[in-house]
């Protein structure tokens, strides 16, 4: 099936699923014999369905966009990471996950704040969804490191690991293995944003106890789009760090 066909099927399935939940719960809310706690649960499910649809639409818009539309600023990367962590804690998939952060260095870089926050948020959300399937208390850890002219954001989860069958296509659009509520675009978009910042996203490690992703960027280098199209971005950053770099 073509990429357009896969995208159309994916959108149709996800939107129909969310709309069905909204419609069914709205019908139940019309009843006068349900207690307050059940009513609250139904309203929460509607909110989660709307959030899922909004995330799907936002991901598709970002996936289909050409170029960068946000201003570049010289900013502390730690502030962006902290905002992404705070945001994912409010997501339904992040509420019951223990998210801990290490001590962040005050490293600055020339960045697209909005897109970089979105990329880190996507990685965090994936980690939370994986950790939720752990047989232990679900945990996600975030570390930030500065090495010469590069900055690394590392995200660890204690989920069951990534299946070998999808590792070669992990960064392809619409790969949703183990994520029934995922858009299948999070890693694709995170990789694109990292490459725009002169870096990449790597799967450093994945087994039954831990999965580790690292997003890297270069402090003072923001690649022009023509360099990205040539396919040169990313490999020099992570090429020696992982066999699963993209």
Residue ranges with predicted function:
Residues 1-12:
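Conserved HAMP-HisKA connector
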Residues 40-91:
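Conserved DHp (HisKA) dimerization/phosphotransfer helix of two-component histidine kinases, i.e.
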Residues 66-70, 108-111, 177:
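Conserved micro-motifs of the catalytic ATP-binding
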Residues 162-174:
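Short conserved segment of the HATPase_c
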Residues 186, 190:
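Short alpha-helical Gxxx[C/S/T] motif in the catalytic ATP-binding
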Residues 96-108:
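Conserved catalytic submotifs in the C-terminal HATPase_c
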């Amino acid at each position: 099936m073509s990429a357009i066909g896969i995208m159309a099927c994916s959108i149709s399935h996800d939107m129909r699923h969310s709309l069905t939940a909204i419609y069914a719960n709205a019908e139940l809310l019309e009843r006068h014999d349900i207690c307050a706690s059940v009513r609250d649960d139904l309203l929460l499910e509607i909110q989660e369905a709307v959030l899922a649809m909004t995330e799907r639409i936002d991901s598709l818009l970002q996936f289909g966009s050409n170029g960068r539309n946000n201003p570049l600023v010289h900013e502390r990367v730690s502030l962006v990471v902290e905002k992404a962590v705070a945001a994912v804690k409010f997501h339904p998939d992040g509420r019951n996950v223990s998210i801990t952060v290490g001590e962040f260095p005050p490293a600055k870089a020339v960045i697209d704040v909005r897109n970089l926050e979105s990329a880190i948020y996507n990685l965090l959300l994936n980690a939370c969804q994986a950790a939720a399937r752990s047989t232990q208390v679900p945990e996600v850890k975030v570390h930030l490191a500065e090495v010469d002219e590069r900055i690394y954001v590392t995200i660890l989860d204690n989920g069951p690991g990534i299946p070998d069958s999808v590792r070669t296509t992990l960064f392809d659009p619409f790969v949703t293995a183990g994520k029934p509520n995922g858009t299948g675009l999070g890693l694709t978009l995170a990789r694109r944003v990292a490459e725009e910042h002169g870096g990449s996203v790597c799967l450093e490690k994945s087994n039954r106890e831990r999965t580790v992703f690292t997003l890297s960027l270069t402090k003072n280098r923001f690649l022009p789009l023509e360099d990205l199209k040539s396919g040169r971005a990313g490999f020099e950053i992570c090429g020696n760090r992982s066999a699963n770099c993209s």
